[in-house]
Design a protein with these regions (language model features):
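Short linear capping/connector segments at secondary-structure termini
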Residues: 53-58, 91-96
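Conserved protein kinase catalytic core
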Residues: 14-16, 60, 135, 155
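Active-site flanking residues adjacent to catalytic metal/cofactor-binding acidic residues
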Residues: 7-9, 53, 128-129
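Short Lys/Arg-rich amphipathic alpha-helical segments
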Residues: 36, 42, 47-52, 68-82, ...
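Pocket-edge positions in alpha/beta enzyme catalytic cores
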Residues: 23, 27, 60-63, 97-102
Length: 171
């Protein structure tokens, strides 16, 4: 069995959109500084790198699944040209209600990836920028790390208990 690092997309790989907004065009998709180098380090350390992302913009009709897949293909291509390999991307296109098994904090995307790609979740990591990301990792049996913006307040940092904190990300 292999090990993986599961990465959330918005706020970890690319700049997070303002609250209540969605990235539906490539022109609005901005990869964060240092992401390609970080993914390349994970690749060299022997981890599969898998993106797991909630994308309810599809359920809201703001973007088709085909367009979302094209955006993810482009993200993968841009990162690959910078020496960073994304092995797979899983997304949840559903609305928050009714509940599904793939929308984080549910572990469905991680469990599916593990089953399809032979991943040992106990030796894998979930890295995200939200409580839902960390919960998904915990629910799947992964180790977890939480990325926080450089401008996070001390109270925001204090309430993060389940994950290792990775500070210094300008998201």
């Amino acid at each position: 069995m292999s090990r993986a690092v599961f990465l959330d997309r918005d706020g970890v790989i690319n700049q997070r959109p303002p609250e209540g907004e969605y990235i539906t065009r490539w022109e609005d998709f901005h990869i964060l500084p240092g992401v390609a180098a970080g993914i390349a380090l994970l690749n060299h350390a022997g981890f599969s790198v898998i993106v797991v992302t909630n994308q309810r913009c599809v359920a809201k009709g703001l973007m088709t699944e085909a367009d979302l897949q094209k955006m993810h293909e482009r993200m993968t291509d841009v990162l690959a040209r910078a020496g960073a390999k994304i092995d797979a991307t899983f997304y949840c296109p559903h609305e928050i209600e009714p509940h599904c098994d793939c929308r984080k904090p549910a572990p469905g995307m991680l469990l599916s990836a593990a089953r399809l790609r032979g991943i040992d979740l106990r030796t894998s990591w979930m890295i995200g920028d939200s409580d839902n990301d960390v919960e998904a990792g915990v629910n799947a049996g992964c180790k977890t790390a939480r990325v926080i913006a450089t401008d996070a307040t001390s109270s925001e940092r204090a309430r993060i208990s389940e994950a290792t904190i990775i500070a210094g990300i300008d998201a």
